[in-house]
């Protein structure tokens, strides 16, 4: 049986004036429905060093090798828009990581581990964090 190849999950970040526009790329061979995750970042380049990443799950969430899964969720309102989001996956990353591309992000409550749910829909919002 041929070993299944897992395409890397990449986040491409384009900077434009005072905001970032990001696109998360899913492996072509996985998932259902063909909906690609997008990241929209509202961030003032002159201030906050940290931003919060909230995985969005419009119809569920994505597990590498398993595709889209049903999951618990809550409503999150950001910039007057309401999104579906996982309750338990907010993470904190340094804004400088965005410029280099996101390979891994570190959960705020688990500094020694990496967030494995990189294929989720992500929403990044500007926040002042401790």
Residue ranges and their predicted role:
Residues 22-32:
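An N-terminal domain-cap segment
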Residues 23-24, 49, 89:
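Residue-level detector of bioactive/disordered segments in secreted/extracellular proteins
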Residues 1-16:
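Mixed-charge, Lys/Arg-rich low-complexity intrinsically disordered regions
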Residues 20-23, 71:
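Short Pro/Gly-enriched beta-strand edge/turn motifs at strand-loop
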Residues 18-19, 84:
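Mature extracytoplasmic/luminal segments of secretory-pathway proteins
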Residues 5, 74-130:
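C-terminal terminal-subdomain/extension
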Residues 30-76:
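Compact nucleic-acid interaction/catalytic patches
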């Amino acid at each position: 049986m041929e070993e299944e190849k897992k395409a890397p999950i990449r986040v491409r970040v384009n900077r434009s004036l005072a905001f970032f526009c990001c696109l998360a790329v899913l492996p072509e061979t996985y998932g259902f429905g063909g909906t690609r995750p997008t990241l929209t970042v509202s961030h003032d380049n002159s201030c906050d060093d940290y931003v919060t990443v909230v995985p969005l799950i419009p119809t569920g969430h994505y597990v590498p090798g398993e595709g889209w899964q049903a999951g618990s969720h809550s409503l999150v309102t950001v910039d007057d828009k309401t999104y579906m989001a996982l309750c338990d996956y907010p993470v904190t990353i340094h804004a400088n990581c965005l410029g280099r591309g996101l390979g891994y992000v570190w959960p705020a409550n688990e500094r020694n581990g990496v967030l494995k749910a990189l294929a989720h829909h992500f929403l990044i919002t500007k926040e002042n964090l401790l």
